[in-house]
Each structure stands twice: as structure tokens, then as C-alpha cells.
Amino acid sequence: MATDRRVSRVSSLIKREVSQMLLHGIKDDRVGAGMVSITDVDVSGDLQHAKIFVSIYGTEQAKAETMEGLKSSVGFVRRELGQRIRLRRTPEVVFLEDTSLERGDRTLHLLNQLQDARKEEDEYIEPAQDD
């Protein structure tokens, strides 16, 4: 079992290398359908599995195409990682769509709506109390 520090270091190395692959290495046109960024890499404690979370900006169709392209390029990504990073065994790679940014944006939007509604309610109540 690797230490937390080593897992963190391997995670950041994988994030950096896969980001470079997205820019220059992966030739699948589907990956370019949406703007892709890696938000997080979760490596298991034994360094055997890596979950790569990606955020995709674009239409729902572009997101679906991009995820298909990423899933089909898993073998290429794993092989490249094995060549670029010195590890005893290259981790199995899985791409997962990270929707936390969208959820956060939606939450902020709902909070802003709630705040605006309270302001309107306060403005409506205050003149009635002055009479």
C-alpha cells in the first residue's frame, strides 16, 4: 500500500500527463467535440486504479461524443502513462464526467434567486409597516 503522499504525487502526475495528452496526443475527433478539462484524478491506495474526472463544456451531444471518445482512448492513455511515468504497474484508467461544476453553478443560481425573492418580499413588507 502506497503512502498518502505518494498517492497524491502519482495523482498529480497522471493529471498533468493526461492533460498534455488531451492537448497533443489523443487524435480522436470526438474528444475535440467539447472543451475538456481534467478536474481531478483519484488513484487507489495500491496505485492500481485511476479515476480521471473530466469537465466537458458544450452541448449534451458534444458531451456524450467526448465521453465516448475518451472511453475509446483508454488503452492509448494507459500505454502513454506507462511510458511517461515510472511505476511498477500502470494503473487501470477510467474516465468519468465530473458534473460538480454544473451542480455548483446551479446551486449558486438558486441561492441568488432566493436572495432576490427575499429582497422583493422585504421591500413589499416595509412600506406596509410604515402606515
UniProtKB/Swiss-Prot annotation:
Gene3D superfamilies per record: 3.30.300.20
SUPFAM superfamilies tied to this protein: Ribosome-binding factor A, RbfA (SSF89919)
GO molecular function: ribosomal small subunit binding
Classification via Pfam families: RBFA (PF02033)
Record-linked InterPro entries: KH_dom-like_a/b, RbfA, RbfA_dom_sf, Ribosome-bd_factorA_CS
Transmembrane feature ranges: none
Location in or out of the cell: Cytoplasm
Keywords: Cytoplasm, Ribosome biogenesis
Gene Ontology CC: one annotated term: cytosol
Keyword match Cytoplasm: yes
GO biological process: maturation of SSU-rRNA
PANTHER family the record matches: RIBOSOME-BINDING FACTOR A, CHLOROPLASTIC-RELATED (PTHR33515:SF1)
Subunit structure: Monomer. Binds 30S ribosomal subunits, but not 50S ribosomal subunits or 70S ribosomes.
NCBIfam families: rbfA
Family of the protein in this entry: Belongs to the RbfA family.
Stated role: One of several proteins that assist in the late maturation steps of the functional core of the 30S ribosomal subunit. Associates with free 30S ribosomal subunits (but not with 30S subunits that are part of 70S ribosomes or polysomes). Required for efficient processing of 16S rRNA. May interact with the 5'-terminal helix region of 16S rRNA.
Protein name from the UniProt record: Ribosome-binding factor A
Species this chain originates from: Gloeothece citriformis (strain PCC 7424)
